Amino acid sequence: MDWGALQTILGGVNKHSTSIGKIWLTVLFIFRIMILVVAAKEVWGDEQADFVCNTLQPGCKNVCYDHYFPISHIRLWALQLIFVSTPALLVAMHVAYRRHEKKRKFIKGEIKSEFKDIEEIKTQKVRIEGSLWWTYTSSIFFRVIFEAAFMYVFYVMYDGFSMQRLVKCNAWPCPNTVDCFVSRPTEKTVFTVFMIAVSGICILLNVTELCYLLIRYCSGRSKKPV
């Protein structure tokens, strides 16, 4: 996956975000994407090759691994980041649409007095108001939903956030109940708890930003003359 391209796109959204939104994006890239790309892959490595069972029965090890780890932690985190980042792309599309409309009006001469040239339209910060407010607020709401949903899926799928050292498996074609050992369980548990904690921080930041936008919206409406 090209994380650099994603950073470029979200960096454009960050320009029009609130201060809390900028903090969220910093946490997303430094504490999640960078950790995932640089450190987590080294810790997990070839998970299936390091998963050892005390049997020589062909296929038993693969079946047991698939039973206890239906989706790799790395792939699940990558999928989570894609879902969490997608709502921000909607904001980027909305901002691009607004700029396109302003360019069209500028070329027609409808708003020539507001801008010197088209380059000024490209660099102007778009205010979060009107229909963009709804798009931006909706994107934050869906980010919270996706974060919470993936945390729940993670907890249910792996039966908690800690990595077991030993798992017992009796799935076919294993001849009986066999013992399987997970490599570096403590290190993996630390990374898992860290990633879950950062997800919780992101949820807190998103909820805080959502409350801030709602309060600002309500206070703005109350100031308008009846």
Swiss-Prot record:
Residues 2-13 dip into the membrane without crossing it. Signal peptide: none annotated. Ca(2+) binds at E42, G45, E47. One of its GO terms (molecular function) is calcium ion binding. Residues 14-20, 95-135, 211-226 are cytoplasmic. Residues 41-73, 157-189 are extracellular. It is found in: Cell membrane; Cell junction, Gap junction. Pfam families: Connexin (PF00029). Gene3D superfamilies: Gap junction channel protein cysteine-rich domain. Disulfide bonds join C53-C180, C60-C174, C64-C169. SMART domains: CNX, Connexin_CCC. Keywords: Calcium, Cell junction, Cell membrane, Disulfide bond, Gap junction, Hearing, Membrane, Metal-binding, Transmembrane, Transmembrane helix. Structural component of gap junctions. Gap junctions are dodecameric channels that connect the cytoplasm of adjoining cells. They are formed by the docking of two hexameric hemichannels, one from each cell membrane. Small molecules and ions diffuse from one cell to a neighboring cell via the central pore. Belongs to the connexin family. Beta-type (group I) subfamily. This is Gap junction beta-2 protein.
